[in-house]
A protein has these predicted regions:
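Non-catalytic pre-domain segments flanking phosphatase-related domains
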Residues: 1-32, 58, 227
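Short hydrophobic/aromatic-enriched beta-strand-loop microsegments
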Residues: 84-91, 105-106, 197, 251-255, ...
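Conserved acidic, metal-coordinating active-site core of Asp-based
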Residues: 119, 123-247, 256
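Mg2+-dependent phosphoryl-transfer enzymes with acidic/Ser/Thr/Gly-rich catalytic loops
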Residues: 21-29, 46, 206-292
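Short, structured coil segments at secondary-structure junctions
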Residues: 81-83, 90-91, 98, 190-193, ...
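Active-site phosphate-binding/coordination module
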Residues: 42-144
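Short active-site oxyanion
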Residues: 60-64, 83-85, 170-172, 230-232, ...
Length: 292
């Protein structure tokens, strides 16, 4: 059996006299954000990222993707990296196998979704909705390729999103147009304590079911795989990644990460353009420098 490398977890115990000692454990699960962490706007993985993920899996470490994307949008990237364990999608609201089999799902209550639609329309915000694997919007404000590439391959234009609310949607996204701070503040003012509201990108303000975030999703998957929290590593770059970075035994923020993401992290990796995610995997899970 392959011996797992020592994982330099930041889980600590307090010794007598105030001394703190770091516990070294083997890494058994790595959760990786996609956009801004593993790939840039070109949606491509670098050779170094591919290599680090492949070696980790060869050594018996489970690697998953933790993203706000839908399963339909996530699975092609998972296939490229040959991810073998369930995927964390919709910010932790849905966990599924690569073959599409659902393991866990939380949905946004329809009456709350209707209120978000009303608020968005009153302000002229670009509101969109995910339901049953498809992506819906009332109008196109960007080229179709924008929605297909960054949000979901299955895009449907529906004049009134309320017509879809005969059952609960998975989540909603309001696409900012230079007004992201205003949207975030407005949603939180009206719906604080009723739903999870988070910024996942400069352009994307997400509305998820209350209690759903990448931290809760990673905790669910860790339990499903019987991996202790202390042996989990998470890497991300945005505010929506902060919960899983804070929850993991070792949380890593990208050098290009948001302030909230970095504040939650145990270690700051180099930025995306310097393959920061691969560097983190090599350093903390593989304990070896990258070699071609």
């Amino acid at each position: 059996m392959t011996r797992l490398p020592l994982f330099h977890s930041h889980a600590k115990r307090r010794e007598a006299g105030g001394r703190t000692e770091t516990i070294h454990l083997p890494c058994r699960l790595i959760a990786l954000d996609l956009d801004g962490t593993l790939m840039a706007l070109d949606l491509k993985f670098s050779p170094r990222v591919r290599h680090a993920v492949a070696v980790a899996q060869e050594r018996g470490i489970a690697v998953t993707l933790a993203t706000g994307r839908s399963p339909l949008s996530t699975c092609p990237f998972a296939a490229e990296l040959d991810i073998r364990v369930p995927l964390i999608c919709y910010q932790g609201g849905l966990i599924a196998q690569r073959d599409g089999r659902l393991l866990h799902r939380a949905t946004l209550e329809s009456h709350l979704a209707a209120q978000v639609i009303d608020l968005a329309q009153s302000h002229g915000w670009h509101v969109t909705l995910y339901q049953d694997g498809a992506f819906y919007l009332p109008e196109l404000r960007h080229p179709l390729s924008f929605y297909e590439g960054f949000l979901n391959p299955s895009v449907h234009q529906v004049a009134d999103l309320r017509s879809l609310l005969d059952h609960d949607p998975d989540k909603m996204i309001i696409i900012a147009q230079g007004n992201g701070d205003e949207i975030l503040a407005g949603l939180r003012e009206h719906f604080d304590g009723q739903m999870q509201i988070v910024r996942s990108h400069e352009l994307f303000i997400e509305v998820n079911p209350l209690g759903v975030d990448k931290g809760s999703g990673l905790a669910w998957l860790s339990n499903y795989l019987s991996v202790p929290q202390a042996q989990v590593m998470a890497v991300g770059d945005q505010d929506n990644d902060a919960p899983m970075i804070a929850w993991a035994g070792l949380g890593v923020a990208m050098g290009n990460g948001s302030p909230a993401c970095k504040a939650a992290a145990d270690w700051i990796a180099p930025p995306l353009e310097e393959d920061g995610a691969a560097v983190a995997i090599e350093r903390f899970a593989l304990n070896s420098p990258f070699t071609k």
